Amino acid sequence: MKVCVIGLGNIGIPVLEYISQRGFQVYGYNVVEKSIKAIETFTGWEDVPKCDVYVVAVSSNSVEDVCKKISNKNKNSLVCIESTVPVGTCRKISETFDLSTLVHCPHRFWVEDPINHGVRQLRVIGAINEESLRLGLDFYRSLDIPLHVCGSIEIAEMCKIAENAYRFVQIAFAEELRMICGSRKISFDDVREACNTKWNTEIPEAREGILGACLPKDTRYLRLLADSAPLLDGAILTDKNYQKWIKRS
């Protein structure tokens, strides 16, 4: 079986290396040249061999363009979208580009702790149809990746953005608490430590604001699905206020 990993960034490179270690014939594709030891990579799409499986690990806004390329090369391949996408994206892509076997198995890779939260960890998978699910399960199980099967591909899409929005809200609460503690001249770190002695309480750290792309982007994706989402709106506003507050402190 030939596999191509598309997008060789923080997620794609570990995925590429992991698949190679499992004994697959694997290639990498990235628009900017990346050199991976003992693995053939390409910057020209026309140079990529025709593969049985394409693993998509590009930024969210590049997924559609990549899937169009896959369709033009081998529309009968299994397409595994690991990138985070808005709900409804995967099915729309499959219909637009006539991709009949497509699954969504969003990554849970954490760059700061690849040992405990790397490529191989429990993940969700959803598919556009039964055949896609069968092929997707066969592929990921051959990689020894444990899976929770979702009843639809939309559930898998929603799961990923909900996970990150949930984390966003948790951090926003910590930021709000830190600002309140600051206004009362009480140590936030001491309050947090005390709170976290309770078995069902785990307040995260409040650092420099919710930076990076993933959590803010995915929270916006979830927010756009609702006419009204006061909790998410409040969390987004809290983070904006906190980032201003931390600069003044």
Briefly describe each language-model feature range:
Residues 44-49, 71:
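Short amphipathic alpha-helix with an adjacent loop that forms part of the alpha/beta core around
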